[in-house]
Amino acid sequence: MAITKIHARSVYDSRGNPTVEVDIVTETGLHRAIVPSGASTGSHEACELRDGDKTKWGGKGVTKAVANVNDIIAPALIKEKLDVKDQSAVDAFLNKLDGTENKTKLGANAILGVSMAIAKAAAAEKGVPLYAHISDLAGTKKPYVFRFLSKNVLNGGSHAGGFLLFQEFMIAPAKTFAEALRIRQGAEVYQKLKALTKKTYGQSAGNYGDEGGVAPDIQTAEEALDLIVDAIEAAGHTGQIKIAMDVASSEFFKDDEKKYDLDFKNPDSDKSKWLTYPQLAEMYKSLAEKYPIVSIEDPFAEDDWEAWSHFYKDGDFQIVGDDLTVTNPEFIKTAIELKSCNALLLKVNQIGTISEAINAAKDAFGAGWGVMVSHRSGETEDVTIADIVVGLRSGQIKTNAPARSERLAKYNQILRIEEELGDKRLFAGNKFHTAINLYL
């Protein structure tokens, strides 16, 4: 089916920063996508094109990316008359039009907006939900697998003020079958956590971080984990909920010294207390022995490959690569060869097209890895990732706290999909890491 119109505009994400929205019009109507944005980004991610004009939006404007869609991509793609159902051909054309290795000419935010909208147009032409179209593109088998939800209920690092080192502390309901019940459990723990945080640290401690989690001014991971365990108990869900963490350690890695500064938000940090990677690895193991931690994301810096491989040898939980792998097949291949981690955090805007994101997931699955589909800290009302996680059959999604409408939009889409599928789905449960292999 021919594309009759492509139009991009600048809209706003959840942090109030500009981002790219793309409309594609075909005979089935208008199909819209909005591109998310990250705060703690890997240096190897595809290029997010920003204007750089500090007098407007602090340099974060996207008028160049919008113009690239309207003035370059739109006329070229319409003229090419590609079938919207042929996602790989469309994405290959977009990459060829850009002509750079990292999408620096047109911008990954321009290209991805078009790629996402194309996928929605294709699903509409086929008369199927987006998750079913994604499943067709990925070649995944049925039934669909429902997921291990990672809800970021406590924010630190670059996503919040205060001195808390680690960026995300997540809860993951893992014992019940119904998606609706797992979302309910997460919401109940979150409400208890807010109440406990305010009681312990004062009313302002219940304020939100970028991703909807509470952001109290606490100092250590142990404080954060104790709060979460207490909230789980107060909600009556002890034993039913696990914990995951995103350390985002690239944010506090000191490259010159090859050490990790656990007090990186303090300008007067004591260098004598900085840790080597074996020392940091022991800290993680100690935390995992004390708390029900099942997954750790970015435990080491993105280029500290030796540290990752060292940790992988002894780790008995999921080790997730985000900044390390940036949803890029080349980095995923290296991580597989070096035995650096055993799971991929899949962020479509890190690589810039739907096709490349699907291929990254397939590479990870092929190595026996888990795949966790993820939002970004600068999110929007677009719910595409909810359909992607179902279509890929990955069994894991990270879309964070049950607060703020841009986060809840994904949970609400998950509920709709669950209702639509009825009993035609499986629950990953404690087998979330290998959900792709689950069959009736």
Swiss-Prot record:
Keyword Transit peptide on entry: no
Intracellular or extracellular location(s): Cytoplasm
Reaction catalysed by this enzyme: (2R)-2-phosphoglycerate = phosphoenolpyruvate + H2O
Pathway: Carbohydrate degradation; glycolysis; pyruvate from D-glyceraldehyde 3-phosphate: step 4/5
A Pfam match: Enolase_C
Cofactor: Mg(2+)
Active site: 211 (proton donor), 347 (proton acceptor)
GO molecular function term, any single one: magnesium ion binding
Residues that hold Mg(2+) according to the record: 246, 297, 322
Any one of the GO BP annotations: glycolytic process
SMART domains: Enolase_C, Enolase_N
InterPro entries: Enolase, Enolase-like_C_sf, Enolase-like_N, Enolase_C, Enolase_CS, Enolase_N
GO CC, alphabetical: phosphopyruvate hydratase complex
Family annotation (PANTHER family): ENOLASE
Assembly and oligomerization: Homodimer.
Protein name, per record: Enolase
Organism lineage: Eukaryota, Fungi, Dikarya, Ascomycota, Pezizomycotina
